[in-house]
Amino acid sequence: MDLVNLCSKLKKGTVYLKDDYEDIVLRMEIIDNSTHCFIKRRGRKEVEVDSKEKDVFESKMDGNEISKEEYDEFR
């Protein structure tokens, strides 16, 4: 997803992405004017990660938007 589109969607609410290459899903939201990023890997619990990390940035760029339901069902 391109950065302009991602930023626009984040201003409206939580954004969910799936990166098929890394086999992870991301949940991003703005809390107190700061972007918080959470990832979930198969078989693991959701964890908060630094949204500026290189791998997270690549997943944001390469990921496809998914629904909250798809995010919740990812295991």
Features from the language model and the residues they span:
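Acidic, low-complexity, intrinsically disordered interaction modules
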Residues: 21, 25-61
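Mixed-charge, Lys/Arg-enriched low-complexity segments
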Residues: 54-75
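Short linear motifs centered on Gly/Pro in flexible linkers and helix caps
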Residues: 15-19, 28, 68
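Arginine residue identity/basic-tract feature
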Residues: 6, 10-11, 27, 41-44, ...
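Negatively charged, low-complexity tracts enriched in Asp/Glu with abundant Ser/Thr
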Residues: 1-18
